[in-house]
């Protein structure tokens, strides 16, 4: 294997949404270094951190239509039955909600939790309280997707946080989506909520670390039996 291929396979790529930020930090480092040389290295530390924040690693997604995959890197912060946000139009009956909180050190690229078709996308403006708080689901800026799957409609909600001020979503209504497929990004700390209908059982526990596109967070009952053992 050539040195070029070794380096390419070792370095985690940066998502294109991060290019302007990385470039800005680098230019600022050059300017600061011109004023006072040690400031260049301080600026480069922030430049590398910015590149790390916008990293976009490849993931290996389990291929099973009964599995629900984590849409985000982070910590499982909530597993509860709640009424879904009204803008999702998923009815008034409680659904299983699994929340994954992303801090500023997590990868912030969001991925689809299941195979299906995007039914709708609904953006709501709001405040920017700590995304780990329960009220963030109702008060904060958010963007909700409804996906039609083989087990019915599920909701995926991107929630802005205390620092995050920009939700990005590249998906469009009526488009097909694959489990683990990238569909959006939230800048600088945020949360993802997944709303699941009856028949879904959680396969993670509170406080567990989840990996977007890889960690199974829930599973739907099927005739073939469970694929993942239930987490206590």
Swiss-Prot record:
It catalyses: a 1,2-diacyl-sn-glycero-3-phospho-L-serine + H(+) = a 1,2-diacyl-sn-glycero-3-phosphoethanolamine + CO2. Binds 1 pyruvoyl group covalently per subunit. It is a peripheral membrane protein. The keyword Lyase applies. One of its GO terms (molecular function) is phosphatidylserine decarboxylase activity. One of its GO terms (cellular component) is plasma membrane. Its EC number is 4.1.1.65. It is found in: Cell membrane. Transmembrane segments: none annotated. One of its GO terms (biological process) is phosphatidylethanolamine biosynthetic process. Pathway: Phospholipid metabolism; phosphatidylethanolamine biosynthesis; phosphatidylethanolamine from CDP-diacylglycerol: step 2/2. The modification Pyruvic acid (Ser) is found at residue 190. Keywords: Cell membrane, Decarboxylase, Lipid biosynthesis, Lipid metabolism, Lyase, Membrane, Phospholipid biosynthesis, Phospholipid metabolism, Pyruvate, Zymogen. Its cofactor is pyruvate. It is an enzyme of class 4 (lyase). InterPro entries: PS_Dcarbxylase, PSD-A. Is synthesized initially as an inactive proenzyme. Formation of the active enzyme involves a self-maturation process in which the active site pyruvoyl group is generated from an internal serine residue via an autocatalytic post-translational modification. Two non-identical subunits are generated from the proenzyme in this reaction, and the pyruvate is formed at the N-terminus of the alpha chain, which is derived from the carboxyl end of the proenzyme. Catalyzes the formation of phosphatidylethanolamine (PtdEtn) from phosphatidylserine (PtdSer). Belongs to the phosphatidylserine decarboxylase family. PSD-A subfamily. This is Phosphatidylserine decarboxylase proenzyme.
